[in-house]
């Protein structure tokens, strides 16, 4: 991924996060990260979703923290390089939303 990640400023957050909040992403209390839970019809759809996200995350060299049980996938995004939320997280969350919508 080109360029060093920087932690989002208050102004950048005000500009970039409302669309993600509107679709269920939440900022984590006590940690500079965003989180969302996804529910699918079954395990195969949940795993397919994770596979599509994983391929994109690898291309971006920006990987989510996630947890899966059967049809549920919990995702947390934060950028280790800047110890907080960066535009990389916003971009990956937006991609994740597109994948989730296409799989429901």
Swiss-Prot record:
The keyword Ion transport does not apply. The modification N-acetylalanine is found at residue 2. GO terms for biological process: tetrahydrobiopterin biosynthetic process. Its EC number is 4.2.1.96. Keywords: Acetylation, Activator, Cytoplasm, Lyase, Nucleus, Tetrahydrobiopterin biosynthesis, Transcription, Transcription regulation. Involved in tetrahydrobiopterin biosynthesis. Seems to both prevent the formation of 7-pterins and accelerate the formation of quinonoid-BH2. Coactivator for HNF1A-dependent transcription. Regulates the dimerization of homeodomain protein HNF1A and enhances its transcriptional activity. Also acts as a coactivator for HNF1B-dependent transcription. PANTHER family: PTERIN-4-ALPHA-CARBINOLAMINE DEHYDRATASE. This is Pterin-4-alpha-carbinolamine dehydratase. The lineage of its organism: Eukaryota, Metazoa, Chordata, Craniata, Vertebrata.
């Amino acid at each position: 991924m080109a360029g060093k990640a920087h932690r989002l400023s208050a102004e950048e957050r005000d500009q970039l996060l409302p669309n993600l909040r509107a679709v269920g992403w939440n900022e984590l209390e006590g940690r500079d990260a965003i989180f969302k839970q996804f529910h699918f019809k079954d395990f195969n759809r949940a795993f397919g979703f994770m596979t599509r996200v994983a391929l994109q995350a690898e291309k971006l060299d920006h990987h989510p923290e996630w947890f899966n049980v059967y049809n549920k996938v919990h995702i947390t995004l934060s950028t280790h390089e800047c110890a907080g939320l960066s535009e990389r997280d916003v971009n990956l969350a937006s991609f994740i939303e597109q994948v989730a919508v296409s799989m429901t």
